[in-house]
Amino acid sequence: MMNRVMHYFKSLLLLELLAGLWLTLKYTFRPKYTVLYPMEKFPQSPRFRGLHALRRYPNGEERCIACKLCEAVCPALAITIDSAKREDGTRRTTRYDIDLFKCIFCGFCEESCPVDSIVETHILEYHFEKRGENIVTKPQLLAIGDRFEAEIAERRAADAAFR
């Protein structure tokens, strides 16, 4: 019975409303933590996982040996690989596609690669103008890897102690 009486007086005096207004007023005059994104940017973690890239060896040969471990381990089924044997008997990829709409950027592909071929770069800002552009092909992945190889190698070397 006492609970009902207390609830009646709380609702009559609008105590819940006043408590909410007090909370709003209290936070109104505190410093803001909003970052105006395009002009200001937060520092990225060294382990940030962004856009994918395929790497090459220093002699120019692509690293991917078409083992398809990254395709098998991908929980979102975002990676599609086709391979063929070359004249020298080694396997190489003929098709390596990543659907960025499906990808959850978990990093399993990067961890499973035995030759460090597929990596996730620090690239955060990219866009698509048409629906089909969300599928990144092998030539595009190799071009990204070639363009950012120095930064990729530097980040991998800094993170090597933690792998």
Swiss-Prot record:
SUPFAM superfamilies linked to this entry:
4Fe-4S ferredoxins
Cofactor(s) required, per the database record = [4Fe-4S] cluster
Report the catalytic activity: a quinone + NADH + 5 H(+)(in) = a quinol + NAD(+) + 4 H(+)(out)
Q: Where does [4Fe-4S] cluster 1 bind?
A: 64, 67, 70, 113
Q: Which GO terms describe its biological process?
A: aerobic respiration
- Co-factor remark: Binds 2 [4Fe-4S] clusters per subunit.
| Main localization (coarse) | membrane
User: Which GO molecular function annotations are given, in alphabetical order?
Assistant: 4 iron, 4 sulfur cluster binding; iron ion binding; NADH:ubiquinone reductase (non-electrogenic) activity; quinone binding
Query: EC class of this enzyme?
Result: translocase
Which EC numbers characterise this protein's activity in its record? 7.1.1.-
Isomerase listed as a keyword: no
Q: Does the keyword Transcription apply?
A: no
The membrane-topology field of this record reads: Peripheral membrane protein
Q: Where does the secretion signal sit in this chain?
A: none
Keywords tagged on the record: 4Fe-4S, Cell inner membrane, Cell membrane, Iron, Iron-sulfur, Membrane, Metal-binding, NAD, Quinone, Repeat, Translocase, Ubiquinone
Where does the chain bind [4Fe-4S] cluster 2? 74, 103, 106, 109
GO cellular component terms, semicolon-separated: plasma membrane
Subunit: NDH-1 is composed of 14 different subunits. Subunits NuoA, H, J, K, L, M, N constitute the membrane sector of the complex.
* NCBIfam families attached to this UniProt entry: NuoI (TIGR01971), PRK05888.1-4 (NF004538), PRK05888.1-5 (NF004539)
Tell me the protein family, please. Answer: Belongs to the complex I 23 kDa subunit family.
What does this protein do, in the record's words?
NDH-1 shuttles electrons from NADH, via FMN and iron-sulfur (Fe-S) centers, to quinones in the respiratory chain. The immediate electron acceptor for the enzyme in this species is believed to be ubiquinone. Couples the redox reaction to proton translocation (for every two electrons transferred, four hydrogen ions are translocated across the cytoplasmic membrane), and thus conserves the redox energy in a proton gradient.
- What this protein is called in its record is NADH-quinone oxidoreductase subunit I
Q: Which organism is it from?
A: Xylella fastidiosa (strain Temecula1 / ATCC 700964)
Gene name of the record = nuoI
